[in-house]
């Protein structure tokens, strides 16, 4: 038998280290799965808390309203940079709204929520050209990029989104977000080598 320390170490190791072959990614993935949605629907139908209270809170947020209007920008700056004013809050708010509306769609099957989320993602995918500025641009690429991907995942079973919007969202991810992740994780940014300036959470974001 393995010593206790080895048993404990094995228990906390990621399961994929022991799994043969390649795991298949299931849609939706990342933060929310179909089993999560199914469980939540049952809890809300049974009027159980905290699910019902949380659902009511979600549906009453201004960032969950199907009438939400996105404000896409061609360039995003997390902080003021040279003669550019910080405007990253536009992306923060819109991506949060896309996720909320996507979640409402998955739980309620209300197509107005799916259309609104799809509209937000389409607006950014057809407008955004760059995430720029200082080093903190990598935080925006990581944090909002991940949230954007989650919003898109929630719409993977909404055919109008899949047919008309998903390709442009994938293109945006491949051309703007993912290259920034690779640049950061590969330590290609000169300032990244200042160990007093950056911490592990920057890499976790990417």
Regions found by a protein language model. Give the residues of each.
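Extracellular glycan-targeting catalytic surfaces
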Residues: 20-189, 197
């Amino acid at each position: 038998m393995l010593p206790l320390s080895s048993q404990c170490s094995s228990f906390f190791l990621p399961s994929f280290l022991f799994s043969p072959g390649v795991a298949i990614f299931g849609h939706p993935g990342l933060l929310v799965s179909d089993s999560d949605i199914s469980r939540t629907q049952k809890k809300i139908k049974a009027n159980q808390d905290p699910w019902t209270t949380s659902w009511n809170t979600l549906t009453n947020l201004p960032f969950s309203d199907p009438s939400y209007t996105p404000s896409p920008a061609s360039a995003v700056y997390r902080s003021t940079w040279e003669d550019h004013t910080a405007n990253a809050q536009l992306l923060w708010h819109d991506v949060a709204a896309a996720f909320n509306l996507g979640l409402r769609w998955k739980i309620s099957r209300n197509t107005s929520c799916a259309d609104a989320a799809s509209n937000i993602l389409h607006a950014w995918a057809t407008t955004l050209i760059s995430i720029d500025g200082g080093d903190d641009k990598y935080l925006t690429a990581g944090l909002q990029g991940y949230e954007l991907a989650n919003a898109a995942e929630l719409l993977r079973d909404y055919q109008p989104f899949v047919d008309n919007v998903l390709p442009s969202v994938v293109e945006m991810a491949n051309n703007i977000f993912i290259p920034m992740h690779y640049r950061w994780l590969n330590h290609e940014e000169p300032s990244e080598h200042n160990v007093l300036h950056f911490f592990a959470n920057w890499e976790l974001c990417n």
